[in-house]
Amino acid sequence: MEKDPPDCIIADSVYPWVYDLARKLQIPTLSFNGFSLFTVSLMESLRINNLLHSHTDSHSDSGAFVVPNFPHPITMHARPPKSFTGFMEIMLEKELKSNGLIVNNFVELDGEECIEHYEKITCHKAWHLGPTSLIHNTVQDQAERGNKSVVSVHDCLSWLNSKRDNSVLYICFGSICYFSDKQLYEMACGIKASDHEFIWVVPEKKGKEDESDEEKNKWLPKGFEERNIEKNKGLIVRGWAPQVMILTHPAVGAFMTHCGWNSIVEAVSAGIPMITWPVLGDQFYNEKLITHVRGIGVEVGAIEWCVDGVGEKENVMSRDIIEKAMRRLMDNSDEAERIKQRARDFREKATRAVQKGGSSYNNLLSLIDDLKRMRDNKTLA
């Protein structure tokens, strides 16, 4: 890079050493961290006020507190463990050495107020260029996004095509969040009690060929899967599912999610309201944007922060709580209809954002102009 330096480096924030190298070589850098600006801005507010860190390495601190000096009144019920915040603090500090932050989101979802707050407290610029899931949006693109699905795309589509609009609950907790057998069992009981049709994505190891009935009955009620297959009421997908394709199908009415940012952006882009169940990392902050600020989701009520998303939590969410959260969005109440309408409104805003003249489209043009200026200024220097 010293002999033939690029005009700019776009650096993933998990590689903080890139910023020091770029500064040494006088190469402009842009950061990308995969979070919403709402979350980055909130974490910066916590960091400035010495509220980012927990007092322990392995567990989160309990106890509610209001995030100070933030554009929205956000109450957090715990602080994450040091193992998460220590890394985040390094990442946030390194990002501020870059020439700006690229965000996979659109202005209307994060909100002008959060953008102004971020730029005020950091003196750092952010470019909203998403949602990227709307840029390549054919059925083939949706089916191929991510890893190879363990379920046939054709079979999944055929099953969804047989269902009424807004009748299916999609349940998925990403690729790094794993629940204990006890929690999965309670989840299955909550699904059964809600009496709604569903697609439930579980870890690939669940249901492996050598899994005994005894092992299976630890995480699924006896006969649960067989009854749902027989009644054509639900699908259990082991491993990776074609999520974008599922979310954009008219049969899907709600999404129970761990609040990973990619999942949230994909749901918002599809106009699907969410049942939020955060587990670790930025997910608890993302939940606040979706439920408290934008009103396009309801909370299960999780407050226990995990270190790595694997293993048992101290508290198991009961089937009654899970059923109640599912029914809030799936039972067609007045509250559910208001939430669904707001979700549809944000789908339209997301679609407009990436079209010509939209906020993300214009931000991309602005970023290109800024990159040209950085290149020209470097040449003149």
Task: Identify what each model region corresponds to.
Residues 260:
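Aromatic "clamp/platform" in nucleotide-sugar-dependent glycosyltransferases that forms part
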Residues 1-250, 254, 268-270, 279-381:
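Nucleotide-sugar-dependent glycosyltransferase catalytic domains
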